[in-house]
Amino acid sequence: MAAEGEAKKDSASNPPGGGGGGGGGEEEEDSSLAVGEAAVGVGEAGGGGGGGEKADREEEEGKEDVEEGGVCKDLVLVEDAVPVEDPEEAAATAALQEEMKALVESVPVGAGAAFTAMQLQELEQQSRVYQYMAARVPVPTHLVFPIWKSVTGASSEGAQKYPTLMGLATLCLDFGKNPEPEPGRCRRTDGKKWRCWRNAIANEKYCERHMHRGRKRPVQLVVEDDEPDSTSGSKPASGKATEGGKKTDDKSSSSKKLAVAAPAAVEST
């Protein structure tokens, strides 16, 4: 384009018909125009090549972004609904898991090589169930649920035979929210944090020390001897005699008062 502008300026400064010098100027103009067009063509070719390379690079970068997850930015991940659990049951299961971890950690190295962590957990759970059964206390449901799930999940027959825990009434399960945490222990408390550490009597709630509380103590009856002594036998007779003498004295004194009062009344009349 710059070459065309220069050619136009030269043509304007040297109008046609200027003689031989004018003819020489036309040849120079034609050569300059050819050179300018060639330069412009080379520049366009170079620019087109550079633009093509840039386009290729942009396409490659776009492909890389797509492969790295650029498309995932437009997607919305929808998570499955989490079932809501009972907070008390979740806390009980969490406490049980912590106890299992502490039990596994307390086992010396090499001592529990015959049992795996899951087997130790199952043994501990069964021992706790046995404690409730030995104390004749209803077994909490959070201790029975894992066993029930393992039985029903092992085969289809178990699921058909025990579809729910409601049919297992003979196990005396505790469906309440406050199960007994330590079966077999005395339940005497001060209403706050303290609790008696002694073991309860069989089929009872309290230990020997706290069994008398809350019950009426029997009244002790005084039993007299059946064989009266000689001295004791004479005393009642003397007492009766004195009582009879007192009664006769009272009668005599009352009669005297009446006798004295009667003549006084006659004299006054």
UniProtKB/Swiss-Prot annotation:
The keyword Transcription regulation applies. Residues 1-11, 243-253 have a biased composition (Basic and acidic residues). Residues 43-52 have a biased composition (Gly residues). Residues 255-269 have a biased composition (Low complexity). Residues 180-224 form the WRC domain. One of its GO terms (biological process) is regulation of DNA-templated transcription. One of its GO terms (cellular component) is nucleus. It is found in: Nucleus. The keyword Transport does not apply. Residues 58-68 have a biased composition (Acidic residues). Coiled coil: none annotated. A motif (Bipartite nuclear localization signal) lies at residues 185-195, 213-217. Transcription activator that plays a regulatory role in gibberellin-induced stem elongation. Belongs to the GRF family. The QLQ domain and WRC domain may be involved in protein-protein interaction and DNA-binding, respectively. This is Growth-regulating factor 11.
